[in-house]
Amino acid sequence: MNKRGNINEYIRSLVASPRMAGEVVHHEILRRRPARECPASFPAGDLVRTILEGMGVQSLYTHQAEGITHIRQGRHVVVSTPTASGKTFIYNLPVLERIKAAPSARALYLFPLKALAQDQLKAFERMAAVAGLSDTATAAIYDGDTSDYKRKKIRGSPPAVIMTNPDMVHLSLLPYHDSWRTFFENLEIIVIDEIHTYRGVMGSHMARVFRRLLRVCAHYGANPVFVASSATIANPGELAGQLTGVRVNTVENSGAPRGRRNVVMLNPRTGP
């Protein structure tokens, strides 16, 4: 029996179950959605094509092309599309383009979890290697687990991309910005991953941190572009704007494919 048959049989059994039947209050089928790739007219550029071919990717999705266009044109943007829709490409590709064009260009990646930073470091280094930019498109993690020796080394000679978290920006970068002068002078792109996690008291705190960050950048003559990624939420542009204090463009219409899905809602008669 194929997978669809297994799922249909499972749902029928669930609805017919003497114990669960009355608890199933809704069943809906979401049809599959094919991928929507960016048009052939999109100016990908030689570097992007090289990276995509090297990673076995045939084409960018429409939302990826839209996000990259905003970044290339110096516009702040938040991308709110489902998990595994390729948001990493949206900021890594323009960052690599900028480093190739100007090796002094710098980027700051902010992640709420250390595990995310580790994963993204590997992804960035792989793209840089495919692009032949491993020598210039360097990256390093700067967080609470970074040894004192390595921190001093990073401060003395910052890599092209620093991957850290908001707390480290607040406690270790901004108060000692004179030690990071070279980095801030050349900072062009600030990536805020999982921006939807910054809400409530934490969100209020981060709004102040981002404003301090922009003031420090302006002090050193830099005007970086914010690139935020978010899970699918109702108001990504409003949230990103409130956090950063700047006008943020929104990319929400995902071009990534989606398989057929069954949505089943239960209303349990008793608690756990």
Functional labels for PLM-detected ranges:
Residues 144-188:
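Conserved helix/coil segment N-terminal to the catalytic DExD/H
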Residues 88-89, 105-126, 231-236:
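Conserved Walker A/P-loop ATP-binding site and its immediately adjacent core
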Residues 69-73, 88-103, 211-214:
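Walker A/P-loop NTP-binding motif
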Residues 64, 80-85, 194-202, 210-239:
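Conserved helicase ATPase motor motifs in RecA-like P-loop NTPase domains
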Residues 96-119, 135-136, 218-222:
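Conserved SF1/SF2 helicase motif Ia
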Residues 116-143, 242-248:
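Conserved helix-turn-beta segment of the N-terminal RecA-like "Helicase ATP-binding" lobe
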Residues 225, 229, 233, 237-272:
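Conserved interdomain linker/interface between the two RecA-like ATPase lobes of SF2 helicase motors
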Residues 1-65, 75-76, 137:
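Helicase-associated low-complexity/disordered flanking segments
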